[in-house]
């Protein structure tokens, strides 16, 4: 008797886009195989399916290839979402936050985290402060009202935004902790300590495929 093939996720542990995809698949209760790539030696099979060469890439059992993290999240919750994670993320406020996260905030985050790539090490504070203004301050204001972006319980937007806030906070942890953004800091701490995050961040053997059971 042959086992039913599972979706195959090409991933990279620390990539925030891959992180959001892994968490969505886990929340949706979807078992999947994960292949943690080696950045300097990307799998030929992945490049044949997705020549852009970035992760995440999800290959479905029928051969369909999803190359964008938000498409993977949407697909996962369209399979199983009794708690309404995806539906509750469709509010105007959440859509606006997500657009800023993946647009203006990510632009500034890259320049803050990797100033040497942009020949602007001396002016690192400028993109840092712009990132706070673009996303973190509005995010804190929204979290003050409910605690999660889905209201009293989280939604897809929480999982989509969290990995990028985590990345920002890790650049200068002491400075981030000093910001007057208590709701955001509590929200981030909660997700960092969440069993979902622990499962999604399990260290996998590089270049090998490991099965994630339905969570």
Predicted regions and their residues:
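GST-like domain detector, emphasizing the conserved glutathione-binding G-site
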Residues: 1-134, 140, 146
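Catalytic cores of nucleotide-enabled group-transfer and carboxylate-activating enzymes in metabolic
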Residues: 35, 43, 138-144, 162-169, ...
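Short, conserved loop/turn and helix-capping segments at secondary-structure boundaries
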Residues: 40, 52, 178-185
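Acidic, serine/threonine/proline-rich low-complexity intrinsically disordered regions
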Residues: 123-124, 173-179
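Surface-exposed helix-capping loop/turn segments at secondary-structure junctions
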Residues: 141-152, 196-200
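GST superfamily/GST-like fold recognition
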Residues: 149-174, 183
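C-terminal end-helix/capping segment
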Residues: 180-197
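Acidic/histidine-enriched, glycine/proline-rich intrinsically disordered or flexible terminal extensions
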Residues: 204-215
